[in-house]
Amino acid sequence: AEGVEKEKQVHLFSNYATLGIGNYGTLNAELFVNQELTANDYVGGMFRHLSSQGGIKDVELKDSFYDTALDLTYGVRGNELAWNLDLGYQNQIYNWYGMPMGFGSSLFPSDRENLIDGINPQQSYNNIYLGGKVEISDNIVKDASLKFNHFSDAFDSSENRFYVKPTFEFGIDNLAIKTNVVVDYLGGSFEKNYFNSNIDPLKYE
């Protein structure tokens, strides 16, 4: 129609990086890269980091934290078959620095200081995963995704999760049927319970 102007196509970037710096020594960084290897296959990666050096006023325990993650992917795109494989790792280190009101107020100042110095508020978490997805044309299995994730922490906690989710699509007479099936397993263990009174690790599935 007359007078209608076509919008300018938005330029999309395959790679980008961001960096932010704030008070308390805060650093926020992110890097994403994607590279076409051939007309059909590609690789990609994502790096993320968020941290603070701490220093909050009147906090008597260490209050810094770190959160770093790396994700990698490789994929192939075809007319009848497309798939990708993903690998990732995340490390988080936190200091749980909160204390009850009046903590150690009944002690002599030197004894209270020694008590606080003996507290280790640090906890670390680790996640590593491997997963992928496949899409198939003209097949009863339309697509399927799967992922394995392992979690651990500084206190010997451990957790494994594995799931598979295929999608089936087929026809019966003139009826089209599409359904998902999910297989999801979760299991792990804790070295100590809340009261630190157990002898053997606590396991669950």
Language-model features, listed with the residues they occupy:
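Transmembrane beta-barrel strands of outer-membrane/channel proteins
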Residues: 19-21, 47-49, 85-91, 144-150, ...
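Gram-negative (and chloroplast) outer-membrane scaffold detector with strong preference
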Residues: 75-82, 127
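N-terminal periplasmic/intermembrane-space "pro-region" immediately following the signal or transit peptide
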Residues: 1-7
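Residue-level signature of outer-membrane beta-barrel architecture
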Residues: 35, 76-78, 134-138, 168-175
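Outer-envelope beta-barrel architecture signal
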Residues: 11-15, 39-43, 79-85, 140-144, ...
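Flexible loop and strand-edge segments within Gram-negative outer membrane beta-barrel domains
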Residues: 52-71, 86-165, 197-201
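Internal metal/ion-chelating core segments
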Residues: 163-205
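Outer-membrane beta-barrel translocator/receptor signature
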Residues: 8-58, 62-68
